[in-house]
């Protein structure tokens, strides 16, 4: 039986600590804290969890963590707020350039997209 937490099916054959990282907003350290609080051993595979353990984990995540859709929308709203107030970071987001001070002379292709080739100017003939 697949265990579903906040709309994400956890992989059955992985350790609990790793499986919880499939949820957006939960990393290794958060998953370790959640499992410790729920009283579940980190090394137990997901398929070996009892229904009570899964329910306890769901309860902890629901009460203490902002994950999946809520977190994604909060991040989007934060970026939109930066763009609306017109600060440097917001402007960089708006024009699609790196936000954190990286150089853009040669690289930054991930943020800028594919290279746009510009034709050379033809030399004047005598």
From Swiss-Prot:
GO terms for molecular function: rRNA binding; structural constituent of ribosome; tRNA binding. The keyword Ribosomal protein applies. One of its GO terms (cellular component) is cytosol. One of its GO terms (biological process) is translation. The gene is rpsM. It comes from Phocaeicola vulgatus (strain ATCC 8482 / DSM 1447 / JCM 5826 / CCUG 4940 / NBRC 14291 / NCTC 11154) (Bacteroides vulgatus). The keyword Ribosomal protein applies. Keywords: Ribonucleoprotein, Ribosomal protein, RNA-binding, rRNA-binding, tRNA-binding. Located at the top of the head of the 30S subunit, it contacts several helices of the 16S rRNA. In the 70S ribosome it contacts the 23S rRNA (bridge B1a) and protein L5 of the 50S subunit (bridge B1b), connecting the 2 subunits; these bridges are implicated in subunit movement. Contacts the tRNAs in the A and P-sites. It comes from the Bacteria. Residues 98-126 are annotated as: Disordered. InterPro entries: Rbsml_uS13_C, Ribosomal_uS13, Ribosomal_uS13-like_H2TH, Ribosomal_uS13_bac-type, Ribosomal_uS13_CS. Belongs to the universal ribosomal protein uS13 family. Part of the 30S ribosomal subunit. Forms a loose heterodimer with protein S19. Forms two bridges to the 50S subunit in the 70S ribosome. This is Small ribosomal subunit protein uS13. Residues 108-126 have a biased composition (Basic residues).
């Amino acid at each position: 039986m697949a265990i579903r937490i906040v709309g994400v099916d956890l992989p059955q054959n992985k350790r609990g600590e790793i499986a919880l990282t499939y949820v957006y907003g939960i990393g290794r350290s958060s998953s370790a804290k959640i499992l410790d609080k729920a009283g579940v051993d980190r090394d137990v595979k997901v398929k070996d969890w009892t229904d009570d353990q899964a329910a306890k984990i769901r309860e902890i995540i629901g009460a203490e963590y902002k994950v999946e859709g809520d977190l994604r929308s909060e991040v989007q709203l934060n970026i939109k707020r930066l763009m609306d107030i017109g600060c440097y970071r917001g402007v960089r987001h708006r024009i699609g350039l790196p936000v954190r001070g990286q150089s853009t002379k040669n690289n930054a292709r991930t943020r800028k997209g594919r290279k746009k080739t510009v034709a050379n100017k033809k030399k004047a003939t005598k």
